[in-house]
């Protein structure tokens, strides 16, 4: 979760984070964040006190909390927790690591804890940690004036700097209301607000001026609870009236009442960026190859540019990256999902052009899509390349021969077009025999894509015939994915058939150009959208049809 603050104040050698309205002050103690409210003369209730941090769990029966509580009792440090029923925060580990020779006051300003207890470590990390561990329980980002408390802390080996993955059931993020502060902390905040000015309130600022927006960046909201001190429990309803400007805390009898907390948890929803444009009315790009070559030369550098160097902070969930950087990262992941080294086999740009990068293949694919008014992100790629023109070293080399760039584009265009036409032919194909026509086995990626395409077509053929159609289409796709010419693929797959429909389709598209608008053939290119969507969905990228 995230909490914004206005400025930092050093008071009694402790760093306080003061809210913009001046009604709340925060400070760290043992890895937990304490919040103190400004006392008001015209308010009959006490200033709200809160403690936000990680609560010990270790499992369903809270074995980690039970172990720490036993160790504290064994060492005579019962003062470190309030009661057996209350939650045990992570600051108890900080007290335990110092063997009780400290007070809460000495733990102030502590965001990172240490533990050398192997029994504690086994609940946090899946492997046995013989040496000590450091637990980064909170972060302060001064440039954003944001306090960040993670759902799971970063755990590091003290000696080897090895970073462990924290067990998911070790901690629970919790926001607790306190009935009072410990004595050492109560003395610390005495007179704190005397030197903190407050802005003049408007007539309608009674509620909003004191509200604290807690931005929840985890999957679920933080737990809420109330922590009572031991003397408060014995009084059975008596509670201490804390006056942060006084040395006394007197118990007074109060009636039961309800009160709204000023800490409002707000779920953070990451922005959804529109990657794919489906606007068929947009202007067509120029058929000139000069601009395409300029982008073709830049796109590899732009997609591989490490934008995280601009902000090396681990914390990026608060939107610290610009929209352009996030879009650039997403486009890089999409191109790798389709044409990357570890991606499944897919349509190529011809056997003589195997050295072009995945980003360049992706650019040519989007160029073909926008020419045929299909969903694409060509304009985004062009804007990114134009935006980073000044950061790319060197000048654009002499343009490659137009025929080379055109040949790559046409090769990819014809492969995509033949893929769609072959799908329609196989859907309408009725095999004369249920026997396998060949012993060749298609690749797993081609078989999966053939299944996807025929599922989209929703054929009602019996399962035995459907299996033959899937195998037939998979063999065709396998040839295309290996950059075999569509005519050669059609010749091989038409052997033994009583129709030359597949071969005729391959011959027809061999004379077509990607740079001419063929309205009749555009419908065949819808098949590639289904395959792209499947690959993006499996890779966790933004899909076209989402």
From Swiss-Prot:
Report disulfide bridges, numbered on this chain: none
Q: Which family does it belong to?
A: Belongs to the alphaherpesvirinae HHV-1 UL21 protein family.
Q: Which organism is it from?
A: Gallid herpesvirus 2 (strain Chicken/Md5/ATCC VR-987)
Q: Does the keyword Metal-binding apply?
A: no
UniProt name for this protein: Tegument protein UL21 homolog
Q: Which InterPro entries match?
A: Herpes_UL21 (IPR004936)
* One Gene Ontology cellular component annotation held by this UniProt entry: host cell nucleus
Entry function: May facilitate the viral transport through neural circuits.
Q: This protein's superkingdom?
A: Viruses
UniProt subcellular location: Virion tegument; Host cytoplasm; Host nucleus
Q: List the keywords (alphabetical).
A: Host cytoplasm, Host nucleus, Virion, Virion tegument
Q: What is its main location?
A: virion
Pfam hit, one: Herpes_UL21
| Keyword Chloroplast attributed | no
């Amino acid at each position: 979760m995230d909490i914004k603050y206005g400025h930092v104040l050093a008071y009694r050698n402790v760093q306080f984070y003061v809210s913009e309205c001046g009604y709340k002050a925060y400070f760290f103690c043992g890895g937990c964040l304490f919040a103190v409210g400004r006392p008001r003369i015209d308010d009959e209730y006490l200033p709200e006190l809160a403690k936000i941090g990680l609560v010990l769990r270790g499992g369903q029966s809270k074995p980690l909390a039970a172990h720490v509580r036993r160790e504290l009792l064994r060492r005579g440090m019962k003062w470190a927790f309030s009661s057996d029923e209350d939650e045990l925060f992570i600051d108890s580990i900080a007290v335990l690591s110092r063997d009780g020779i400290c007070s809460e006051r000495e733990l102030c300003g502590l965001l990172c804890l240490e533990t050398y207890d192997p029994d504690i470590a086994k609940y946090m990390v899946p492997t046995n940690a013989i040496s000590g561990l450091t637990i980064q329980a909170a972060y302060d980002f001064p440039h954003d004036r944001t306090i960040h408390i993670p759902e799971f802390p970063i755990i590091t080996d003290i000696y080897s700097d090895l970073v462990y993955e924290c067990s998911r059931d070790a901690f629970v993020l919790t926001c607790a209301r306190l009935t009072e502060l410990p004595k050492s902390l109560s003395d610390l905040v005495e007179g704190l607000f005397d030197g903190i000015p407050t802005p003049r309130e408007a007539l309608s600022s009674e509620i909003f001026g004191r509200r604290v927006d807690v931005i929840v960046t985890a999957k679920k909201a933080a737990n809420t609870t109330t922590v009572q001190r031991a003397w408060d429990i014995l009084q059975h309803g008596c509670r201490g009236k804390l006056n942060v400007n006084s040395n006394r805390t007197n118990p007074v009898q109060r009636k039961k009442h309800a009160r709204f907390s000023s800490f409002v948890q707000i779920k953070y929803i990451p922005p959804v960026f529109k990657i794919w444009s489906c606007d068929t009315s947009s202007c067509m790009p120029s058929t000139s190859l000069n601009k395409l070559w300029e982008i073709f030369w830049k796109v590899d550098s732009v997609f591989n540019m490490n934008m995280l160097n601009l902000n090396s902070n681990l914390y990026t969930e608060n939107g610290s990256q610009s929209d352009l950087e996030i879009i650039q990262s997403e486009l890089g992941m999409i191109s790798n999902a389709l044409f990357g080294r570890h991606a499944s086999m897919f349509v190529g740009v011809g056997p003589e052009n195997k050295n072009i990068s995945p980003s360049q293949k992706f650019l040519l694919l989007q160029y073909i899509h926008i020419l045929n008014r299909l969903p694409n992100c060509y304009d985004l790629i062009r804007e990114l390349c134009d935006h980073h023109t000044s950061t790319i070293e060197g000048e654009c080399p002499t343009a490659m021969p137009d025929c080379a760039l055109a040949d790559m584009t046409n090769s990819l265009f014809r492969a995509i077009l033949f893929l769609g036409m072959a799908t329609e032919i196989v859907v309408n194909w009725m095999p004369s025999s249920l026997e396998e026509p060949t012993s060749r086995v298609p690749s797993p990626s081609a078989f999966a894509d053939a299944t996807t395409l025929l599922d989209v077509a929703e054929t009602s053929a019996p399962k035995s015939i459907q299996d033959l159609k899937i195998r037939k289409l998979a063999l065709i796709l396998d040839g295309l994915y290996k950059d075999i010419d569509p005519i050669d693929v059609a010749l091989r797959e038409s052997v033994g058939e009583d129709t030359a429909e597949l071969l005729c389709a391959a011959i027809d598209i061999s004379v077509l150009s990607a740079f001419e608008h063929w309205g009749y053939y555009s419908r065949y290119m819808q098949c590639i959208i289904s395959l792209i969507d499947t690959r993006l969905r499996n890779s966790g990228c933004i899909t076209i049809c989402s």
